[in-house]
Amino acid sequence: MTHQSIKKKSFLNLVLLILSGELIFLLPYVLARVFRPTFLEVFDLNNFELGSLFSVYGIVALLSYVYGGVISDKYPPRKLIAISLFFTAFGGVVFATYPSFLVLQILYGYWGFTTVFLFWGAMIKATRIWGGTNSQGQAFSFLDGGRGLVAASMSSIGVLIFSFFLVTEIELTTLSQRKEAFRYVILFSSFIVFFTGFIILFLMKNKEDTVQTTNNFSSISQIKKTLKIPSVWLIMIIIVSAYVGYKVTDIYSLYASEVMLFDDLESANIGRCNCTLDL
């Protein structure tokens, strides 16, 4: 294999990691962030109920982060990433039916498993493999910057789809019409997530598939050893603090609707711009 073909293959792997790294959270997070007023209305939720859904997701995700790393040491990242995208997309089909609050709680717990346990450790491992021994910083900077670009692009497409399927002016639409338009946004998002998993399964080919599996007990002992390092806990605090600040921006579209009295489409555009500013 020539050096040029290896370089192209490596670049393709990075692009696929960037796509999957953001699209995996499109259904559980990005839609609620961009379309917050519409989201609450079509699912008949209040802010407390939406927060409880995220809490269910967070509890499952917290456990998944710990044990997901063990799974990523045992199986090829390519397969884990693809499977997690497939399962997450299947949840989107249920999401599009506007299920009851109880089913939504189960669904968000399910997404906490599919987007973290099967995915996160595998994505981090695949990114480290791409970066090699000398380009770890470059690899993760490309990953995070690229994810921001994907979020901005997908939120713009989502707003466009929502506006396209609104048959009349937003002020004149009924709840059922807004639900139908938003259903297309959910189904499109589910399709994109599934299709990305399909591409990754067949196109992401590299040395990650030849990595030998690690004994589970060895991985768990390494986790325990790592948790004894003080700097690891400081990094945890930094990351949590950064995400707390980041999550505050989720209410911008709702603020635009309830305080500035923007309509649902204008509020969604505020949410879209918020994703763009994350770049």
Where are the model-predicted features located?
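Glycine-rich segments within core transmembrane alpha-helices of 12-TM secondary carriers
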Residues: 138-166
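Juxtamembrane intracellular "pre-TM" segments in multi-pass secondary transporters
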Residues: 1-9, 206-234
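Extracytoplasmic
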Residues: 13-45, 68, 154, 248-253
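C-terminal membrane-cytosol helix-exit motif in multi-pass small-molecule transporters
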Residues: 158-167, 188-211
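C-terminal ends and interior cores of transmembrane alpha-helices
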Residues: 86-100
